[in-house]
């Protein structure tokens, strides 16, 4: 009795403190996505567990595609009439997720929604999952990312595995084309819905270093029937027989990909539906697959889920569009070789002139080790000399980025270093050509803030 009374007081004070902190920070014009949760957890360390009770929760984790997959799922839930909230501001650590639950709950700790859609950082997932009894866990993929923070891919995979071990009641939605992700089925008892793509996406794709070239069981080199990107595709081990499992939700045909969208055919249990995916890029086809798998777990009709893919709003910085100085600007977050090469795959389809900008930071959220840029096939852009008008580099490590482009073969006079974000946008849009900006995470936040203030767009958290 005394414990329950004490816990109720702690919950009340923690939620109150969180709401007050969030409101104050927003009044000051800041994001306030993480700090309010840290304050709340100081008062009540178990706050997330108390607030998440009785809330049907789906968690999305993995290296690439978490935010976009979450936005796709969000649209399908909206169209299906589900009452939910989501951490769409990108606060995906324990403190940020706790803050989202708190601001969507009453002061007594009662959530105002029946469902929650939570994007979780892959390293934070094992902590978040201790407090949230998820109905489903969506694992997008596992790639090498921020070596100083995550270590090698097997370490990231272990973090996800531990998180799923905490999620004993969850159905797993797992990428069948990722040999690392698919291996989770071998070591965990959870039911699994596999998703994947049955065919190559690009006929002329960027050649990449594989993050998982060897069998996770016996260490023999994989043989691929086809590759979609990175180490994803139709893998099989000729030594022990480990191979890509047959996905329940899969793309059977890629009908078309262009600058604006992709058209595909989805199949689930023998039933096929066409879908137009509102964002371009092969990696967004995978994100759409993950969304369709999550919809299956939630009992959402396949046609309704497919239709939602044509109308969802992209996450901030994820193929986000702006109109600046009569030029179309598209911002595409990058953070590792696999994701960056996928952006290059997208760009190499262009036949019209454009301006390219890369903004490289080395803060904790970006990864302090920026050596990964040397594993990206920027040389591929040289083949686009006729349509690539100018290259701009910016950010804390702009000089490193400029050096990388020099080694890729671009003449020095074509590489413009501009560390001031406002001036960068003015110069890059000066020719009125389409501009494609590739920033790392903290560069994206800073650049996004500059665009909001200077050109009248909303802040990322609004």
Language-model features and meaning:
Residues 63, 88-89, 119-121, 141-142, ...:
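Fold-independent oxyanion-binding glycine-rich loops
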Residues 70, 126-128, 148-149, 182-185, ...:
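Short glycine-/acidic-enriched loop or helix-start segments at secondary-structure transitions
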Residues 2-26, 31-33, 219, 232-234, ...:
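ATP-dependent carboxylate-amine ligase
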Residues 3, 193-337:
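Adenine nucleotide phosphate-binding catalytic loops in nucleotide-utilizing enzymes
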Residues 73, 77, 97-101, 288-298, ...:
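Buried hydrophobic packing segments
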Residues 140, 173, 287, 291, ...:
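Residue-level signal for inorganic ion chemistry
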Residues 34, 55, 68, 92, ...:
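Conserved active-site and cofactor/substrate-binding residues in soluble primary-metabolism enzymes
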Residues 2-196, 204-214:
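Phosphate-binding loop of NTP-binding sites
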């Amino acid at each position: 009795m005394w414990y329950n009374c004490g816990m109720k007081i702690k919950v009340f004070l923690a939620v109150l403190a969180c709401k007050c902190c969030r409101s104050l920070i927003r009044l000051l014009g800041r994001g306030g996505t993480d700090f309010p949760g840290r304050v709340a957890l100081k008062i009540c360390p178990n706050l997330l567990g108390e607030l998440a009770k009785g809330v049907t929760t789906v968690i999305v984790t993995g290296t690439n595609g978490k935010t976009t997959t979450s936005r796709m799922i969000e649209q399908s839930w909206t169209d299906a009439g589900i009452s939910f909230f989501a951490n769409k501001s990108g606060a995906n650590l324990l403190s940020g997720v706790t803050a989202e639950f708190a601001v969507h709950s009453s002061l007594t700790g009662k959530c105002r929604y029946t469902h929650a859609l939570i994007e979780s950082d892959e390293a934070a997932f094992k902590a978040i999952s201790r407090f949230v009894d998820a109905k489903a866990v969506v694992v997008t993929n596992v790639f090498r990312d921020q070596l100083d923070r995550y270590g090698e891919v097997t370490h990231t995979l272990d973090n996800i595995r531990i998180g799923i071990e905490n999620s004993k009641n969850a159905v797993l939605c797992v990428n069948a084309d990722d040999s690392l992700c698919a291996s989770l089925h071998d070591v965990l008892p959870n039911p699994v819905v596999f998703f994947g793509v049955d065919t190559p996406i690009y006929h002329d794709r960027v050649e990449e270093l594989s993050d998982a070239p060897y069998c996770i069981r016996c260490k023999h080199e994989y043989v691929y029937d086809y590759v979609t990107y990175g180490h994803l595709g139709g893998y099989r081990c000729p030594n022990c027989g480990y191979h890509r499992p047959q996905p329940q939700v899969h793309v059977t045909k890629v009908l078309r990909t262009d600058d604006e969208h992709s058209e595909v055919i989805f199949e689930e249990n023998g039933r096929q539906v066409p879908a137009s995916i509102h964002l371009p890029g092969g990696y967004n086809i995978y994100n759409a697959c993950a969304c369709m798998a999550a919809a299956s777990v939630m009992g959402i009709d396949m046609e309704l889920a497919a239709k939602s893919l044509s109308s969802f709003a992209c996450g901030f910085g994820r193929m986000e569009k702006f109109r600046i100085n009569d030029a179309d600007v598209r911002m595409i977050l990058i953070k590792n070789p696999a994701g960056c090469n996928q952006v290059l795959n997208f760009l190499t389809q262009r036949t019209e002139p454009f301006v390219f900008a890369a903004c490289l930071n080395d803060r904790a959220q970006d990864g302090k080790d920026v050596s990964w840029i040397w594993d990206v096939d920027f040389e591929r852009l040289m083949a686009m000399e006729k349509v690539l008008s100018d290259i701009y580099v910016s950010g804390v490590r702009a000089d490193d980025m400029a050096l990388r482009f020099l080694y890729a073969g671009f003449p020095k006079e074509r590489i413009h270093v501009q560390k001031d974000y406002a001036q960068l946008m003015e110069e890059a849009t000066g020719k009125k050509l389409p501009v494609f900006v590739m920033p790392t995470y903290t560069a994206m936040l800073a650049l996004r803030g500059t665009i909001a203030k200077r050109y009248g767009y909303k802040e990322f958290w609004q």
